[in-house]
UniProtKB/Swiss-Prot annotation:
GO terms for molecular function: antioxidant activity; chromatin binding; fatty acid binding. Belongs to the calycin superfamily. Fatty-acid binding protein (FABP) family. InterPro entries: Calycin (IPR012674), Fatty_acid-bd (IPR000463), ILBP (IPR031259). It comes from Bos taurus (Bovine). The modification Phosphoserine is found at residues 39, 56, 100. This is Fatty acid-binding protein, liver. Pfam families: Lipocalin_7. GO terms for cellular component: cytosol; nucleoplasm; nucleus. The keyword DNA damage does not apply. The lineage of its organism: Eukaryota, Metazoa, Chordata, Craniata, Vertebrata.
Length: 127
């Protein structure tokens, strides 16, 4: 399955609680909670580029499945992680006590991030 495309956030659950759990300042949480960000994904074999635009903030991360890489987290912090593919439609990684699962189903992408007992879920649609 090729994951390439542009996707816009449609819904999100537990945004504020998750952002607080990862240390995001309250003023940034309030500014970002209603932004319907756009993610552009470019896949070339096992290599991926994610360009995430939320308001004026742009985060660009590149990785190759199964290889350690450095990525920018939503807090602006640089993290090291290894992204794995599970089955035909899931990208999974764990970093700093956070498990991230991105699942592709047709034109819908469901991203779930879990830290402790706080689960943040974001659903995006292809645009």
């Amino acid at each position: 399955m090729n994951f390439s495309g542009k996707y816009q956030v449609q819904t999100q659950e537990n945004y504020e609680a998750f952002m607080k759990a990862v240390g995001m300042p309250d003023d940034i949480i309030q500014k970002g909670k209603d932004i319907k960000g756009v993610s552009e994904i470019v896949q070339n074999g096992k290599h991926f580029k994610f360009i995430i635009t939320a308001g004026s903030k742009v985060i660009q991360n590149e990785f190759t499945l199964g290889e350690e890489c450095e990525m920018e987290f939503m807090t602006g912090e640089k993290i090291k992680a290894v992204v794995q593919q599970e089955g035909d439609n899931k990208l999974v990684t764990t970093f700093k006590g956070i498990k991230s699962v991105t699942e592709f189903n047709g034109d819908t992408v469901t991203s779930t991030m879990t830290k402790g007992d706080v689960v943040f879920k974001r659903v995006s649609k292809r645009i």
